[in-house]
From Swiss-Prot:
It catalyses: 7-phospho-2-dehydro-3-deoxy-D-arabino-heptonate = 3-dehydroquinate + phosphate. It is found in: Cytoplasm. GO terms for cellular component: cytoplasm. This is 3-dehydroquinate synthase. GO terms for biological process: amino acid biosynthetic process; aromatic amino acid family biosynthetic process; chorismate biosynthetic process.
Length: 383
């Protein structure tokens, strides 16, 4: 049984997308308000809650109680925990369960969980009956600051991360920071990588604030809500300007070109969480930027130092069993990166750094340069 939630005044961040705009509501102890918020948005709608086994143990009962208290009929769909559910088999299961539950276009799907559940439930909502609205109730730090915002949904392919999906914006995001108390330390750290990302890509002052306040964010003080809100504001602003990732939104993929390849190489397993891959990927992107003469070595050292202080991996050798087949091979990693969603006309696209808080999108890095860079990084790692 989870500890009782203690309320705080919520912060609301608007994702401005015209008639598809929606609110991100952030606060401690706000999960019980979910039912009344949904009832106000969709009177009479039924709700199918999609969650995973771990989250169901902690938060499904409270979520159902909130919905039922607002007079909302509910059903539940529980999937396996982890990336294993973000698959063709996983999306088939959720879609069939939604159809069996007779969820109609005027009903709602509620994604109660971390990034995997949000991506999976959102994709199912996008394609069942050619589109059902959905609400994100993110329960991991990573989901609260990143994956629940912006409408990217989808599943993995054996060929790579997030290669099958759709843009489908939620109608509401309710981020209760109290639920983060049930995360394991490793899960929390993995989510923190995405928080640090916002400072690196466009806000040096925020990165400096994180360096000072990281310990308080971990403790769950008001600094945690501030970090979540600042991250959501940063992402919401970019999404409002570039919803479909035709330009600026690509900056949000800082660290992801390398990181997704590493996740694929490790079989989407517990060897490497998504945020851990992003952490290593951001350091690699910074180091590649330095090699290209774009960023000062002192900035790279500062990035590496803060991520390491936060308990995140920063080197390839930090990955468990990194010498296994498919990881410790530069050509293999290059092949995986060639499947990245940002590839255009066969050329890799990287998010590189000119300084902390100054990121740029580049398709000008020669593949041979990247391959040699990776080969050196792999050779640096002890056997």
């Amino acid at each position: 049984m989870s500890a009782p939630l203690k309320n705080s005044d919520p912060v609301t961040v608007d994702v401005a997308l015209g008639d598809r705009s929606y609110d991100i509501v952030i606060g401690r102890g706000i999960l019980p308000s979910l039912g009344e918020r949904i009832a106000a948005l969709r009177p009479g709608a039924r709700v199918a809650i999609v969650t995973d086994e771990y989250v169901a143990t902690h938060w499904l009962r409270a979520t159902e109680a909130s919905l039922l208290g607002a007079g909302i009929a509910t059903s539940r769909i529980v999937v396996d925990e982890g990336e294993v559910s973000k698959s063709y088999e996983g999306i088939e299961f959720v879609c069939e369960e939604l159809i069996k539950a007779r969820i109609e276009r005027n009903d709602l799907v509620v994604a109660l969980g971390g990034g995997v559940v949000g991506d999976l439930a959102g994709f199912a909502a996008a394609i069942v009956r050619r589109g059902v609205d959905f609400v994100q109730v993110p329960t991991s730090l990573l989901a609260q600051v990143d994956s629940s915002v912006g409408g990217k949904t989808g599943i993995n392919s054996p060929q790579g991360k997030n290669l099958v999906g759709a843009f489908h914006q939620p109608i509401l995001v309710v981020a209760d920071t109290a639920v983060l108390d049930t995360l394991s330390p490793r899960q929390f750290r993995a989510g923190y990588a995405e928080v640090a990302k916002y400072g690196l890509l466009g806000d040096e002052a925020f990165f400096a604030w994180l360096e000072t306040n990281h310990a308080d964010i971990v403790k769950g003080s008001a600094a945690r809500e501030s970090a979540v809100a600042a991250s959501c504001r940063a992402k919401a602003a970019i999404v409002a300007r570039d919803e479909r990732e035709t330009g600026e939104r690509a900056l949000l993929n800082l660290g992801h070109t390398f990181g997704h390849a590493l996740e694929t190489a490790t079989g989407f397993s517990d060897r490497l969480y998504h945020g851990e891959g992003v952490s290593i990927g951001m350091v690699l992107a910074a180091e590649l930027s330095a090699q290209l003469g774009m960023i000062a070595d002192a900035d790279v050292a500062r990035i590496r130092r803060h991520l390491a202080t936060a308990g995140l991996p920063t080197r390839l050798q930090d990955i468990a069993g990194f010498r296994q087949e498919g990881l410790a091979d530069a050509d293999g990693l290059m092949a995986l990166m060639a499947q990245d969603k940002k590839v255009k006309r066969g050329r890799l696209t990287f998010i590189l750094l000119q300084a902390i808080g100054q990121a740029v999108v580049s398709s000008d890095v020669e593949p041979s340069t990247v391959r040699d860079f990776l080969a050196r990084k792999l050779a640096d790692a002890p056997a």
